Amino acid sequence: MDGRIIKALSGYYYVDTGADIITCRARGKFRLDGTSPLVGDRVQLDVSPDGTGSVREILPRRNYFIRPAVANIDLMVMLAAAVNPVTDPFLIDRVSALAAHHSCDFLLCINKADLNPGDELFSIYSASGIPVVRTSAVTGEGLPELSERLAGRVCAFTGNSGVGKSSLLNALSPELSLLTGEVSQKLGRGRHTTRHVELFALENGGYVADTPGFGSFDIEQMESIRPAELQYCFPEFEPYLGSCRFTDCTHRNEPDCAVRAAADEGKIHPSRLDSYRRLWEQANRKKDWEV
């Protein structure tokens, strides 16, 4: 029997077979192999007469992320806001680069649009070839479009704490009843209300993963991207790659760099080029043999 792991907690794996949710343990061979089933994994399982199961095989993964530990994500939805707590564009760029590196589609969701539509963020990212949608859990703005983008796909939601992930998911599917947290007036950030990764089935045939806070996407995970690969994680760079004077151009300080020339002409936003440079420096700190 095949199914998808929708939750992993205290050594138990909850597998959705399409007909039922079966509570499973993992076979001992995974421990011996040093591998672990992840939320999102497609697995083969054996079911006992008492209705419990055991995970026998992990089917090939499309992708997987280290932190948060989740596999087979089709779409990464990054929630941002132009109001308290304001999202740093560098964090958006870091997550979008990770998504691209893992062959995962990326969607920027500017939430709390009823308070601030985030015109600058919308301008930067729509011009960069990144899909953007404005949403509000209060007014319902953008929810139909967001729901359409999630249909039939496994999607991970992330964003800095307090940006409204749980509230937005509740607005999309009220039956989820996810715990929400108010934004601290003193700290300017929200309390973490998501403690573990879990996939929630939607009526449109998709799944959403409400993942723990933004700190999960740490520098260690970014360093799995080698410096030479990073340029392919910025879609607006693509028309200019191969047009630099040097074939191994890093687009940082080499002469006759087509990417920097495009930025000078306003075809690439300065903040995106700056983020690329910062991420390149992070990736360059770890040598190839250390990855």
Residue ranges of predicted features:
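Helix-rich effector regions associated with P-loop NTPase G domains
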Residues: 34-49, 59-76, 81, 97-106, ...
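Phosphate-binding glycine-rich loops and their immediate beta-loop-alpha structural context
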Residues: 83-129
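Short aromatic-glycine-enriched beta-strand elements
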Residues: 11-15
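Structural detector for short beta-strands of small beta-barrel domains
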Residues: 1-9
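Canonical P-loop GTPase G-domain recognition
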Residues: 112-163
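A conserved segment at the C-terminal end of the G1
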Residues: 165-181
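Beta-strand/loop nucleic-acid-binding surfaces
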Residues: 21-37
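Short, Lys/Arg- and Gly-enriched loop/turn segments at beta-strand edges
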Residues: 50-58, 86-88
